[in-house]
Curated annotation (Swiss-Prot):
Gene that encodes it: babam1
Compartment annotation: Cytoplasm; Nucleus
Record's protein name: BRISC and BRCA1-A complex member 1
Signal peptide: none
GO cellular component, as recorded: BRCA1-A complex; BRISC complex; cytoplasm; nuclear body; nucleus
Assembly and interaction partners: Component of the ARISC complex, at least composed of uimc1/rap80, abraxas1, brcc3/brcc36, babam2 and babam1/nba1. Component of the BRCA1-A complex, at least composed of bard1, uimc1/rap80, abraxas1, brcc3/brcc36, babam2 and babam1/nba1. In the BRCA1-A complex, interacts directly with abraxas1 and babam2. Component of the BRISC complex, at least composed of abraxas2, brcc3/brcc36, babam2 and babam1/nba1.
Biased composition (Low complexity): 35-45
Upper classification of the organism: Eukaryota, Metazoa, Chordata, Craniata, Vertebrata
Database matches in InterPro entries: BABAM1, vWFA_dom_sf
Length: 370
């Protein structure tokens, strides 16, 4: 019996020797300390749910929350070796609900605020999308006697008539537009006292040009603009789109009138159908007006009234109008036709257009009012 007691005492001493290494030794606890600073690595890391799967966030959460917990646990294990595990577990479990309010109080990323509703624009006209959809171009050529006057100055210095120059520039316009987009279609209308549809819509420039040069001028007493629009209405059907501002149209219709008469203000009483056509966002009415404004007899300013009448037809502000003097160089007529090559849905307002690379304001104004 005496021999067994020392054995038991030795066993107890042996167990006491093992305890500091496994349970109550602070140094051993520090060795077993996890990267989060907690004493028991088997417990789930409390900061992880707060920061998600981001690895850097674990270190940030441990540096802010875990050290006070680990210091308390170490002090408890040093004073009460047997109850160290229970105290540590209690401290860690108690720290879990304590950290939840800290997680809730963390600043959240600012949520994007919903933009305030912008009131609709006060513009009176609607703009279609700026797309390069096919065009149906109706070229209306005036055949009044003013077109046959030998007044325009060609490049070589000789005098030529406006009809000859207009025929050449129309051919260049049609062929250039065809190279830009082969889906464009062209038609030809001649204007005497009445308007006559001469060539139907075609995408072949040669077909239109074959009808362009066999034309002669006539003495015209009047000009009925409404009759011209009625002829156009019989040959076209404008697209009907539900959402004008977002859905591109299958095509647009553009009328290009080359006109040279000085009969004062135009007599024009449009019907409801003509008004609807002029107000359509898919119809454009461009005008190249030839006049005698720079002749020696400058007292006659009736051409200005005619030009003002054409300007009043544009209720949308999207049409282009040019006035060219018959006493000037013929190249000005070509320049105006070149400016009309731009797609009507993609070009700017005429008052905003600039055709010069120079910064001189005077030059820009001259270029915009050719």
């Amino acid at each position: 019996m005496e021999t067994t007691e020392p054995g038991q005492a030795d066993g107890e001493e042996r167990m006491m020797d093992l305890r500091p290494r496994t349970r109550s030794n602070p140094e051993g606890a520090e060795d077993r300390r996890s990267s989060t600073g907690s004493l028991n690595s088997s417990l789930p890391s409390a900061p992880q749910p707060a920061v998600g799967s981001r690895v850097e966030g674990e270190g940030e959460a441990a540096s802010s929350d875990s050290p006070p917990v680990s210091a308390t646990a170490i002090a408890a294990t040093a004073s009460v070796p047997v109850a160290a595990v229970g105290n540590t577990t209690t401290t860690n479990t108690a720290s879990l609900p304590a950290m939840s309010p800290a997680v809730k109080e963390r600043p959240k990323p600012s949520q994007p605020t919903m933009p305030t509703q912008i009131p609709p624009s006060a513009e009176l006209h609607l703009r279609a999308p700026r797309v390069n959809c096919p065009e149906k171009v109706i070229i209306c050529l005036d055949l009044s006697e003013e077109m046959s006057l030998q007044k325009l100055e060609s490049i070589n210095g000789s005098k030529t008539n406006a009809l000859n120059i207009s025929q050449k520039m129309i051919e260049m316009f049609v062929r250039t537009k065809h190279k830009i987009d082969k889906r464009h279609e062209f038609a030809l209308v001649v204007v005497n006292d009445d308007a006559m549809w001469l060539s139907g819509f075609t995408s072949d420039p040669r077909e239109l040009c074959s009808c362009l040069y066999d034309l002669e001028t006539n003495v015209c007493e009047s000009f009925n603009l409404e009759d011209l629009f009625n002829v156009i209405l019989q040959k076209i059907e404008l697209p009907q789109m539900e959402n004008i501002q977002t859905i591109p149209p299958p095509f647009v219709v553009r009328t290009l009138l080359v006109f040279s008469r000085h009969a004062g203000m135009l007599q024009f009483n449009p019907s409801d159908a003509v008004k609807k056509m002029l107000q359509s966002p898919y119809f454009f009415f461009d005008v190249v007006f030839l006049h005698n404004g720079t002749e020696e007899q400058t007292e006659d300013t009736s051409w200005k009234d005619v030009y003002a009448s054409f300007c009043e037809l544009d209720t949308k502000g999207m049409c282009y109008r040019f006035e060219v003097s018959l006493c000037g160089p013929a190249i000005e007529l070509h320049n105006c036709m070149a400016k009309l090559l731009c797609h009507p849905l993609q070009r700017p307002f005429q008052s905003h257009a600039s055709y010069s690379l120079l910064e001189d304001e005077d030059t820009l104004e001259n270029e915009a009012t050719v």
